[in-house]
Amino acid sequence: MFELNNFDALQIGLASPEKIREWSRGEVKKPETINYRTLKPERDGLFCERIFGPMKDWECHCGKYKRIRYKGIVCDRCGVEVTKAKVRRERMGHIELAAPVSHIWYFKGIPSRMGLILDMSPRALEKVLYFASYVVLDPKETPLLKKQLLNEKEYRESIDKYGDDSFVAAMGAEAVKTLLDEIDLEQSSIELKEELKTSTGQKKIRIIRRLEVVESFRKSGNRPDWMVIDVIPVIPPDLRPMVQLDGGRFATSDLNDLYRRVINRNNRLKKLLDLGAPDIIVRNEKRMLQEAVDALIDNGRRGRPVTGPGNRPLKSLSDMLKGKQGRFRQNLLGKRVDYSGRSVIVVGPELKMYQCGLPKEMALELFKPFVMKKLVQNGLAHNIKSAKRMVERVQPQVWDVLEEVISDHPVLLNRAPTLHRLGIQAFQPVLVEGRAIKLHPLVCTAYNADFDGDQMAVHVPLSVEAQAEARFLMLAAHNILKPSDGKPVSVPTQDMVLGSYYLTMDKDGVKGEGKVFSCPEEVLMAYQCKAVDIHAKIKVRLKRVVDGETIEGIIETTPGKIIFNESIPQDLGYIDRTIPENKLKLEVDFLVSKKTLGGIITRCYMKHGATKTSIMLDKIKAKGYHYSTIGAITISTSDMVVPEAKRELLENTEKQVEKIQKMYRRGFISEEERYEKVIDLWTKTTEDVANALMGSLDSFNPIYMMADSGARGSKSQIKQLAGMRGLMANPSGKIIELPIKASFREGLDVLEYFISTHGARKGNADTALKTADSGYLTRRLVDVSQDVIVRQEDCGTEEGYEVSEIKEGNEVIEPLVERLSGRYPSEDIIHPTTGEVIVKRNTYMNEDIAKKVSDAGIKKVKIRSVFTCKSKHGVCARCYGMNMATSQKIHIGEAVGIVAAQSIGEPGTQLTMRTFHTGGVAGADITQGLPRVEELFEARKPKGLAIVSEVSGTVKMEETKKKRTIIVVTDDGEEVSYDIPFGSRIKVKNGDIIAAGDEITEGSINPHDILRIKGVDGVKNYLLSEVQKVYRLQGVDINDKHLEVVIRQMTRKIKIEDSGDTELLPGTMIDVFDFEEANKEILEKGGEPAVGRIALLGITKAALATDSFLSAASFQETTRVLTDAAIKGKIDPLLGLKENVIIGKLIPAGTGMTRYRSIQINTDDENIEEDSIDSIEV
């Protein structure tokens, strides 16, 4: 059986007039829509039932045939087929045009395809098409040239001069169609290739462009004259509906107006032609018809757009596809789904990690079909209809059935904006009273949810497969690690941290200090009877069974630590248990803060897996909430102690500032030096006041506890509360040299308050802008990398990518261990001293092996990387390495491209927006934060360009009065000099030895320069380290592999420079793998291979250059992408995720991959024993 969705690829092309007539069910001859009295469609009009099908199911227009029994009969009176009304969504009509018109996409697009293939300028073409000039079609014996333009006067003169039939000239689309008809594609292709060999410069570029269009037509089987339309297809009426409003008026789709204009003008033209009207009138009518068709296809592309009531431009066919509200993004990629609901969320601290609270009435509506089925199964209802009635009337027995249905049916919870894959997780529902969804506090971080009125959506997975995937892959208890860096995301926050911190503190001189207890239970009893304080240092006798023998001994601890350790596995490796005296020690014998909690969770996950970790987390959560309540840690103004030393510090600084001002007035220092010195002084003083404050706070001071534990607040906030606010920036970002000396505790005066409003306002404005920019960056990243899926186990590449520890100055930011763990080496790693092989190539390195390599003193290692992966589509599991979200090897089918895009985009909102101004120094404004990331991924020429050395050699400096020059002397003695503009800071010194591609002045480098000087590896390295720099500055950790995936997509295309004997055209972009394949083929035949060089594309360009036209069209520039694809007759292989979502197939990732869908199960019936059959429950 032919299934509509059962195809592997999709091709787009130009439609011939014959094809359009073949699609159509009849010609639309009248501009009428529906009869205003009967409200029935007019015959032969835009809604005609004879052409498009009946308005009502199984009912013809005249009413002769009603009911399903006449299915398929065509009424003899009105000619309407008796069928379902939904055929009005698929049946098309057509309009036969009295004169051909050109298709605006192919004439007006950039570059004009029609112009290129005819070798005419778009302006000349426009004159012909819109009846301003004649074009010579056949000069015959006259000295006129073919395709020469003649205006009315010249045409008349030529006819007078050469006689009536001496040459053929015409105007309008008919003339263009004749010219297009005459084109011999094979011949043109040969001629252009010959011309290409000899031409240069602009002429060469034009020939390449023309050749591209000619080759597209030649290879795709499209005919050039199909760019001129003889027949216009009319889309089905239910896709351009007309609906009656309350007041009896009609609302209609704009398309109907546009079609009406075309039909009106076409009919008028037919009439004029029949009457034999004068040429000038006919010509005007033809021009109007051309304009009407242009407006229908793409309104506003040429001239002023056609407007409807209220001067609103009408939405044409192109507008229906374009933009966020167009067909692609609104309906194909963003569908609304049934079995879903949304409500406000409230906190549910009593829930287990895998549970969520679902309001009863919501659950009943969501699980309605399941409840109805169960009611019938349990014999509570006789049939589905009565079951439905029971549910609708909410009879008491329905609730019991609902409990039963819900018991192991997970639901998905989603919070918008879904910035990464943890924005949708699965939970086991628990029915709750009220109308709010209850959410577990530990998943709030992943959702970025709080309970100030946030709403969340619930979705029900229906099929058994969907339920299984939700339970095994999406359950909240399984999603403990962040896919971007592999650190835990379900870390307790706020109260839970505060409670744990409070529990693990110790205090001197409190009740019960020094007491000795016989067992932990006795300690708890004493604490509950208030005989011992929770922070008292006590001794307790512990028993533990180790390797089958019981050990006992006395340890020193506090009741709080004993309570906290009840929920922690005692083998996490914090304590070396091989030392005898450590065997009984408590695992967590230190003060627990948010940071250390993260470490505890990571260790527990690595050692015991997700389930045990989620149980531990629930216990920590319960204890944290309980003891933060008991601790009663609150904020009061008396907790903000202004430090004694503050006054003295301020007075000293003021004296020093006065000294600096004096020096400036005497002319010893410049204005700039004065400003910098004053700023430095105040910065240091603010820091000193803060340190004095932190030193004076008691460790049991509630504000200090909150900040120190990481529950809420930070050192800088405490500094502002009780120290001094410090320096502020003015609206342009320059620091004002008058600091705010007061703290919030003391209160600000009017001027201080005014100064602080600048920053506050700028912060709010920035946040709003940042969210939109960050969202757009994520969208581009997703589009460029969405088809990167792990498609094979090993691509077999020998190449690797060299990594070493990352240093900034003398500080190691990322040690080698972090860069190696979870990867495969691409060559054997050999011990530098002993010479033994530590790790064989292609062996998975976990953290222990990576540590071993690092401890051996090895500084650089070549690893398998996404950069060097040879998989044609997607990547292979070896080059990718570890899946950050599970700390296991990655599985085939994982959509690593999307995960990479989300990992880079999600922290985007945390990055700053600002450009730092360095006090008016020319050319030194460096972009940072989000704009810098965008600049790198778009491969733009950055602001504040650095001068880069093109050669390697030694630096020589020359300074004259007018300018500074740096000369680089190469080893061969060749000198390359660079003029340094005033105000730039030089990075090199006299006599320095530098490599090609190194910066001479400070600033950002243009990535295209690095590509030119250092090659593709250099640019990949540069982009990776620069993007990482921005994120690291904000304290955001992103694993390198995510950036590698995106950067690989940016460097996948090659620009052909010389085609050799291949079919490739010079100047065109082609995929690296296709390029290598084409060359391999030619070399086997003994021909000359093509030459090209890697092109660095920005993410927008790279996303549009994908093989899939569906994906590109749904991203940006829809009309341009589709025009290009149609002419080339492109085939979309449907390999990525977007294109499959668009056509409604399962995405080829995870269990939707073809290799998983095509598994066959063979059961050998004979070998199953009789008695074992019963035990298998399905």
From Swiss-Prot:
What biological-process terms (Gene Ontology) are attached? Answer: DNA-templated transcription
Q: Which cofactor does it need?
A: Mg(2+); Zn(2+)
SMART domains for this protein: RPOLA_N (SM00663)
Question: Record's superkingdom?
Answer: Bacteria
| Catalyses which reaction(s) | RNA(n) + a ribonucleoside 5'-triphosphate = RNA(n+1) + diphosphate
Q: Which CDD domains match?
A: RNAP_beta'_C (cd02655), RNAP_beta'_N (cd01609)
Q: What does the UniProt cofactor note say?
A: Binds 1 Mg(2+) ion per subunit. Binds 2 Zn(2+) ions per subunit.
Alphabetized UniProt keyword annotations:
DNA-directed RNA polymerase, Magnesium, Metal-binding, Nucleotidyltransferase, Transcription, Transferase, Zinc
The cross-references to Gene3D superfamilies, in alphabetical order and at most eight, read: 1.10.132.30, 1.10.150.390, 1.10.1790.20, 1.10.40.90, 2.40.40.20, 2.40.50.100, RNA polymerase II, clamp domain, RNA polymerase Rpb1, domain 3
Q: Which residues bind Zn(2+) 1?
A: 60, 62, 75, 78
Any one Gene Ontology MF annotation carried by this entry is: zinc ion binding
So where does Zn(2+) 2 get bound?
795, 869, 876, 879
| One Gene Ontology term, aspect cellular component | DNA-directed RNA polymerase complex
Its EC number(s): 2.7.7.6
Give me the residues that bind Mg(2+), please: 450, 452, 454
InterPro entries per the record? DNA-dir_RpoC_beta_prime (IPR045867), DNA-dir_RpoC_beta_prime_bact (IPR012754), RNA_pol_asu (IPR000722), RNA_pol_N (IPR006592), RNA_pol_Rpb1_1 (IPR007080), RNA_pol_Rpb1_3 (IPR007066), RNA_pol_Rpb1_3_sf (IPR042102), RNA_pol_Rpb1_4 (IPR007083)
Q: What the protein does?
A: DNA-dependent RNA polymerase catalyzes the transcription of DNA into RNA using the four ribonucleoside triphosphates as substrates.
Q: Which family, according to UniProt?
A: Belongs to the RNA polymerase beta' chain family.
Write the protein's name.
DNA-directed RNA polymerase subunit beta'
Q: Which organism is it from?
A: Clostridium botulinum (strain Loch Maree / Type A3)
